[in-house]
């Protein structure tokens, strides 16, 4: 599928088509597929307990969450990313179809409009709050940071995971209609950046390093003490960084209130889930918490990418 090919020939008239067909004729659109293993996969059912990474465990209770079981956990994770949502959906649909009778679908989310930059060539996108998101995210070209914060290395107790990463997902609902009624100055103080420019409130341009010691004309912190960028910064968290690759989402309209349902489908990769836990705990006092709420959560161990002749699970099951 990542090469734009059919799963199999669609020629037998008296059998279901091997490929569902909706992406026939579509370009590959930079399709990538990532596989992850959840903590529960390593329980007594499959004899994999001895191969469970020590760092892989269900996330502990964290601030500002009320998790819905319908969007939480899972034994396996499939993430398909593409410039064409149809191509991504085709990949997930056909992989799920192959697992019919063996796996049970737990939850699925369709994201749109990435919410962070991952390469230096990308312009910073905006989230549903209207702010630029991911300005200080790790970039793929920063190999030292990728090795230091994203890729699992020799520190793991499981050789099959070396070169892979841990994936954390959080479905974060945003109360967009309440946010839209807030004053611009309040919005900027909550985030810690200018809404249009993306520059930190301490001054400069979007990519100016925030000065968390700067004061405004009244002698108050230019970036408020509870601003999102302050509490989430690596300076505030002992140097902790993660690679964010999230998307916006919408679930339509709340049938009970008539309000818009949408928010951030947070996705991040890291060397150890403890990195995310530290950052999320630091956000307990985030001023943004008035407008967002975590309703889904999962963590997975993702093995490294495949080379020719390799297959998913090869390192884990052999």
Locations of the language-model features?
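Long, histidine/aromatic-enriched segments associated with O2/redox biology
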Residues: 1-318
